[in-house]
């Protein structure tokens, strides 16, 4: 057991005196003569092996050194955080408004309405930041890239030949799904195989070939050709195939005049000879004919897909361009109910609109207003808007509508 003499001899170094001892030791390090002789002798007698490099450093000096450095570090960190925040705002601007800059006008009739928000200079960013590394939080894939690489990536995704508009949707899960598909899965950069390219080329060739033949063989006759919108044929063909792969059993099409004859022959399989006979002056009506013009008539057929046959029908359509919309929706709902399709997945409605009529006909909005109701909902409709830039009211947008695009009213229903 330690004797009381030893205890008293070391009592001045107990923990209760630590603050006093540290202050005294700080003074000793600054100037040994500033402390009493007995304390100076005590500090001199300390084993220097316990002192780093044989010489201790004043804690006050260390604190002062870091204190002077702290504002610089804080300033640099704050600047980096602010820059990163500006980059996030730029990324979000591309996701929200990149479609305005997309190359959608091959004839260059209108200048794209490019907002300043798609320029990095709109934010607190400059040329010196282009080579700096920033975080690009792309859905589940978080990585660092230079600002220059981030901008080039966003331009490729959102400002190429396809525009994507989805940030008006209120459900975060849907927005995240789009971001993941476009950015993480790099959907816009998907490469087609040579077989797919050849197949699309053949479909385009069939569409253009029929259009040119009808134009030269029956000049001056109304036919509402597909010229300028030939890509509609491979698009519709792809939709039918993918609907079949997804388990759809029936597809109901509704469309107006533009490109209808081409769709009848090149997608739905109407015999060309039957179409040509309708152009001839000696065409005779039979009991199956209504006497209506050829570009009002419909047809139905079974089309083979990788998942089996899909029954596809194109309804008759009158001259009132969009009046077929609620007819198709009603037909689809009746078919779904008859099949017991409560998930609304076996019968798919596809409506093909003209650019002018889609924004001008009130029946479009009336049909949309019923889309989410319990009695008339069909689980969603695929809308295709055709604008070959030579149709009615397309020469000057200012004379056609009061919105930048014809589908602006779809945003009210959170449609993509």
What spans do the regions from the language model cover?
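Hydrophobic alpha-helical scaffolding
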Residues: 11-14, 29, 76-80, 140-144, ...
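Single conserved hydrophobic/aromatic residue that forms the stacking wall/gate
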Residues: 407-409, 414-416
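Extended, charge-enriched "interface" segments that sit outside catalytic cores
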Residues: 9, 46-227, 231-232, 248
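Short acidic (Asp/Glu) and glycine-rich catalytic loops that position anionic groups and cofactors
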Residues: 2-5, 17-22, 127-135, 215-219, ...
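Cofactor-binding active-site loop characterized by glycine-rich and histidine/acidic residues
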Residues: 249-406
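Active-site pocket-lining segments that scaffold enzyme catalytic pockets across diverse folds
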Residues: 214-273
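Generic, well-ordered alpha-helical scaffold segments in large soluble proteins
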Residues: 23, 27, 31, 42-45, ...
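Subset of Sec-pathway N-terminal targeting signals
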Residues: 3-53
């Amino acid at each position: 057991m330690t004797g009381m003499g030893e205890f008293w001899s070391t009592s001045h170094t107990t923990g209760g005196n630590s603050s006093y001892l540290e202050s005294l030791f700080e003074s000793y390090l600054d100037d040994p003569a500033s402390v009493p002789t007995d304390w100076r002798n005590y500090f001199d007698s300390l084993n220097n092996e316990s002192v780093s490099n044989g010489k201790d450093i004043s804690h006050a000096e260390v604190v002062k050194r870091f204190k002077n450095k702290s504002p610089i570090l804080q300033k640099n960190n704050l600047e980096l955080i602010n820059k990163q925040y500006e980059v996030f705002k730029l990324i979000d601007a591309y996701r929200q408004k990149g479609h305005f800059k997309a190359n959608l006008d091959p004839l260059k009739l209108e200048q794209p309405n490019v907002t300043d928000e798609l320029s990095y200079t709109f934010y607190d960013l400059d040329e010196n930041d282009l080579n700096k590394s920033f975080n690009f939080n792309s859905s589940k894939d978080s990585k660092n890239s230079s600002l220059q690489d981030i901008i080039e990536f966003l331009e490729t995704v959102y400002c190429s030949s396809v525009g994507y508009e989805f940030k008006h949707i209120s459900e975060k899960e849907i927005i995240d799904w789009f971001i993941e598909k476009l950015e993480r899965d790099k959907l816009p950069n998907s490469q087609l195989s040579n077989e797919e390219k050849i197949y699309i080329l053949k479909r385009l060739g069939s569409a253009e070939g029929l259009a040119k033949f009808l134009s030269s063989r029956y000049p001056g006759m109304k036919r509402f050709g597909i010229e300028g919108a030939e890509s509609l044929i491979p698009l519709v063909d792809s939709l039918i195939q993918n609907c079949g792969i997804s388990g759809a059993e029936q597809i109901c099409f509704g469309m107006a005049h533009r490109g209808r004859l081409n769709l009848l022959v090149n997608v739905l399989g109407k015999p060309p000879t039957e179409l040509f006979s309708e152009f001839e002056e000696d065409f005779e009506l039979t009991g199956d004919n209504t006497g209506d013009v050829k570009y009002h008539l419909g047809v139905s057929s079974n089309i083979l897909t990788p998942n089996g046959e899909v029954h596809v029908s194109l309804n008759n359509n009158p001259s009132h361009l969009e009046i077929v919309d609620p007819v198709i929706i009603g037909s689809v709902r009746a078919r779904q109910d008859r099949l017991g399709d409560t998930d609304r997945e076996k019968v798919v409605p596809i409506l093909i609109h003209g650019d002018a009529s889609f924004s001008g006909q009130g029946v479009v909005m009336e049909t949309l207003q019923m889309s989410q109701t319990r009695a008339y909902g069909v689980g969603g409709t695929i809308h295709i808007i055709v604008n070959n830039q030579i149709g009615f009211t397309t020469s000057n947008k200012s004379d056609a509508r009061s919105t930048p695009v014809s589908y602006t009213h779809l945003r009210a229903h959170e449609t993509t």
